[in-house]
Amino acid sequence: MENIKIKKLAEKYGIFAKKSLGQNFIFDLNLTDKIASHAKISNQDHLIEIGSGAGSLTFSILKQNPKSLTIIEKDHRCIALLKEMKQYFSNKINTKITIIEGDFLEIDLKEIFDKNYKIISNLPYNIGTKILFLLLEHYQKIDLMILMFQKEVCQRIVAENNSKKYGRIAVMVNFLCQTRYLFDIAASNFTPAPKVESGLVEIIPRERPIFDIDLKLLEKITEIAFNQRRKMLRSSLKPLTKDVNLWLEKAEIAGDLRAENLTLEDFARLVRGIG
């Protein structure tokens, strides 16, 4: 199979990218090898790939001989290709390969996360952040995530306060994880080429949140604050309390600041001070 281009294999099974599924395929194994290398895969690692598509990244992962790989793929057209790939590797590596046909957003993840995993995936553009927030609910069962998004989404994930990209996603992700932007991926690497650039991020879950607070309340506060990000906090946070000035005073945060000015510690003080 190494002599067969993944693109030819996809053609064999009539697989082409569907816009409705947010698909953009990579056929360059040099690139997917580079992506997989950032997961630092050992033969003791259990991996999950979400949305394998035409299988280039799957192939690169399997070449690293992990202990197991669970592939979750919604597109029925891709299943036969994955089964052929599984057969190809069956006498070459010791990896236990499990193929699950289904929508990741509808699967019972408690059954999936029976052990700790590394996650590596080229996420569908249209539901990438939704998948990320779902994964964060199981952060204690995840050792590492290497994820591909639109470049703008990557920038929002790793953004720091006082920047235009800083928002709810940066706060929620970085409360639970350490994040790092790895590299740009040009649109020309995809078939079809999307209208935007992509990027790769490394997300390493912490053993526990960086601050011990009510995360559901943090989610609510960040949603309200960043939905009106140009407003000062004394105005944007009014819907959450009867006395916003007293709340901000208890949290030791100036009312004329905006959500984008706050650090993670500031948000933690807001959560603790609302009571």
Write out the residue ranges for each language-model feature:
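Catalytic cores of RNA-modifying enzymes
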Residues: 1-224, 265-272
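C-terminal lobe and adjacent flexible extensions of AdoMet/dcAdoMet transferase-like proteins
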Residues: 205, 222-275
